[in-house]
Amino acid sequence: MASLKELKGRIVSVKSTQKITKAKKMVAAAKLRKAQAAAEAARPYAERLEGVVASLASKVGASDSAPKLLSGTGKSDTHLLVVLNSDRGLAGAFNSNIVKAARDKALELQSQGKKVLFYLVGRKGRPVIARLFPGQIIEQYDTTGIRDIGFDQASEISARVMELYEAGAFDVAHLFYSKFRSALLQIATGQQMIPVPPPAEAPASSGAAVEYEPGEEEILADLLPRNVTIQIFKGLLENAASEQGASMTAMDNATRNAGELINKLTIIYNRTRQAAITTELIEIIAGAEAL
């Protein structure tokens, strides 16, 4: 059994840890409000842009003059998985869930005879993916030191991904990130990004005749790169909100667990102290009787 000094030391240590986790929970809660507002503000624009691109794509179809980001390379042998992670831990299963979704997709593609490459954003997913898929990380985007990752970083990432696409490094690109639902729920999500996938259902028609100037293909040539950037930007914002939500929940759980452990250790400490006092009293009484 641990001594009173050891028990007291453990209680002090756990209380110190509890103060840290409580402070981190409060910081995450403050950051969550800002990140959630940014993610929710970006969703309508990103979804509307996807709808416009899908509508134009359905009109252009697979014509020979269609932009490459729409028509594709004509094959689907090599797939690039763009995986968005964070640089920090203490966020529960936030990073591991994204890596798991990307891993499952990679294994599925490899079982079909496809070649899989990875473009990684953030540090946390690198060790696992490097171990599971050695030699398949084509590039890494370092976010170390970036306080609030945003549109500038999304533009750099999308520009590099499209550069690799034009160079023939891959045929299909998928984006993996965590979709924010609430502080308690974040969903690891994967979606095809390049070439633009056909809409799940035919775009709704308003009944009005629409003419495009200079033309659908020219407009698509301008919108498609922007759409790639916006989808990555949306993923980064969703990730930021998801990370703070997961961190707040994890720190709340850690704070409550620390409280429970403190209570248990305090009970053990009091029982041990009471037993020691009782033993001393018995020894004193026995000594007095001997006299």
From Swiss-Prot:
It is a peripheral membrane protein. This is ATP synthase gamma chain. It is found in: Cell inner membrane. F-type ATPases have 2 components, CF(1) - the catalytic core - and CF(0) - the membrane proton channel. CF(1) has five subunits: alpha(3), beta(3), gamma(1), delta(1), epsilon(1). CF(0) has three main subunits: a, b and c. Belongs to the ATPase gamma chain family. One of its GO terms (biological process) is proton motive force-driven plasma membrane ATP synthesis. It comes from the Bacteria. The gene is atpG. GO terms for cellular component: plasma membrane; proton-transporting ATP synthase complex. It comes from Sphingopyxis alaskensis (strain DSM 13593 / LMG 18877 / RB2256) (Sphingomonas alaskensis).
